[in-house]
Amino acid sequence: DILITADIGNLYEAKERDLLQGVSSKVLEKNIPSHLRDEDGKWFAITKRARLFVYNPKTINPAHLDDYFSLTKPEFKGKVITRSSTNAYNKSLLASIIAHHGEEKSLEFVKGLVNNFARDPKGADKDQIRAVASGEADIAIVNSYYLGVMANSGDKVDEEIAKEVKVFFPAQKTTGAHINISGAGITKFAPNKENAIKLIEFLTSEEAQGQLAQGNYEYPVNPKVKPAGIVASWGEFKEDTIPLNEVGKQTRKAVEIATKGNWK
């Protein structure tokens, strides 16, 4: 009845392949801002996360950071890390840059980013955070919730690492930090459509959103719900409100540009 998945690229592809059906729900319209749901009612965000910078405050001056392009500055050569461009979160980040700035400027971004890598991309987002804390690199591009998970993991090493690094929200003077989501849609031939809609309505209610925010350290999509304590401690930030379908449209182009720019 329901497809639930992470990443706007996956939700957009499901819509393009005609796997989802449109839903009209006043409850969902009230619970979810318009840029976080499909204009045809085929998918709806349930949680969201920011693609942000985690940095070592001993070696990085945050006054020198700005948008994602700031990581291509010569002063950051040999200091930046992130995971592979084949990862869905980096594909969607690059797709959002293409949507805002076009292909030519996005290729410049990729080439500049790769030129500043401290190492070839490897590992997941937690591995990038650990590498920053260990001194292998100075700044990483990661999803926000990974730091929250590490800070509350019960693993003393990871909890200490989470205290050592700092968070920076990119593009606060321009587009806002890139947002990705986990979302849900009703499958095209769902036998229990009405109950499926009720489930998504519940998942975006204040009650469920509070539980999700506290449980996985993602940002709630329902504006009435506050994030978990550690997430809130990073401060409020400006998020990119581009309709996420515009990001999904550029996912394939993002793969091409990452390949052309040698982002492994």
Question: What are the residue ranges of the model-derived segments?
Answer:
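Ligand-binding clamshell of periplasmic/extracellular solute-binding protein-like
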Residues: 1-21, 140-147
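A structural signal for short loop-to-beta-strand junctions that line the ligand-binding cleft
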Residues: 1-6, 21-53, 69, 80-81
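Short beta-strand->loop
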Residues: 21-29, 43-44, 69, 139, ...
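A bilobed periplasmic-binding-protein/Venus flytrap-type ligand-binding module shared by bacterial periplasmic
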Residues: 52-59, 179-192, 211-212
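Short loop->beta-strand "edge-of-pocket" segments that line small-molecule binding or catalytic clefts
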Residues: 70-88, 96-98
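Ligand-binding pocket segment of bilobal, Venus flytrap-like solute-binding proteins
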Residues: 85, 92, 96-170
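Periplasmic-binding protein-like
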Residues: 78-86, 202-226
